[in-house]
């Protein structure tokens, strides 16, 4: 190009032939090189296993390469929880972690979709909380571990003055405590988590994912 030749067919020497092109979403540009996937211990903020791959490797694939290589190099290292961003929000991840008795804390990818209807007339909100036919987010009412399901109840039930009453303008049930729905975890392990994404427990645990940024610094 320095000599005005834009289409040069001269032989070239590539010192790093396995480099390729990747997309940096934070900088909104392409780059040439490698991608570093670092597995971090969220309690100590210390790196556990670094793994380099081609720049074109998607984060979801980078995790698989790093995770299974880590397990081969560190077979005694115990993993009980994983904290991952929405790039890893795919059903096979949840199914694998369940088989391995690992609790996943994975942010939902809004582009991955949700079932339009659950149990005939409920919809599922963006964080996995059921929404009643009247459009109200249901209130969590515990988990039945033996049955593998979470219980959500009507949020419009009032106990004011020691009396139980429904404050909804269009109640969808005549039951004393209003409408109840059970989310069966096996129905959709991606959407239905224990603890659920709407809970303080989930958010507190997921906040520890910032250990990645602290480790990189």
Language model: regions and residue ranges:
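Polybasic low-complexity intrinsically disordered regions
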Residues: 1-99, 105-109
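Alpha-helix-centered segments that form part of catalytic cores
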Residues: 11-35, 171, 184-189, 193, ...
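Long, low-complexity, polar/charged, intrinsically disordered or flexibly structured peripheral segments
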Residues: 22, 153-194
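A short glycine-/small-residue-rich loop at the edge of a beta-strand within enzyme catalytic domains
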Residues: 54-58, 81-84, 88, 123-126, ...
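Short, intrinsically disordered/low-complexity patches at protein termini
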Residues: 71-73, 117-118, 129, 156
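Contiguous terminal or domain-adjacent regions
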Residues: 106, 128-132, 161-167
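Short gly/pro/ser/thr-enriched loop/turn and capping motifs at secondary-structure boundaries
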Residues: 111-116
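Short amphipathic alpha-helical "interface-anchor" segments enriched in bulky aromatics
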Residues: 118-150, 185, 189-217
């Amino acid at each position: 190009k320095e000599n005005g030749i834009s289409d040069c067919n001269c032989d070239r020497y590539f010192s790093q032939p396995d480099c390729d092109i990747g997309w940096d979403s934070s900088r909104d540009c392409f780059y040439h090189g490698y991608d570093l996937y670092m597995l971090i211990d969220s309690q100590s903020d210390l790196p556990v296993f670094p793994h380099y791959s081609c720049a074109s490797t998607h984060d979801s694939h980078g995790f698989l390469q790093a995770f299974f290589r880590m397990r081969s190099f560190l077979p005694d290292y115990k993993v009980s929880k994983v904290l991952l961003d929405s790039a890893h929000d795919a059903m096979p991840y949840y199914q694998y972690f369940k088989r391995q008795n690992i609790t996943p804390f994975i942010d939902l990818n809004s582009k991955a979709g949700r079932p339009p209807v659950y149990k005939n007339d409920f919809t599922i909100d963006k964080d996995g909380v059921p929404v009643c036919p009247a459009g109200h987010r249901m209130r969590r009412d515990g988990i039945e571990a033996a049955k593998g399901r979470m219980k959500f109840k009507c949020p419009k039930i009032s106990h004011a003055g020691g009396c139980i009453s429904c404050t909804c303008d269009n109640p969808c049930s005549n039951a004393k405590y209003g409408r109840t729905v059970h989310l069966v975890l096996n129905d959709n392990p991606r959407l239905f988590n224990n603890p659920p994404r709407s809970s303080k427990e989930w958010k507190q645990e997921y906040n520890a994912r910032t250990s990645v940024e602290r480790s990189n610094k």
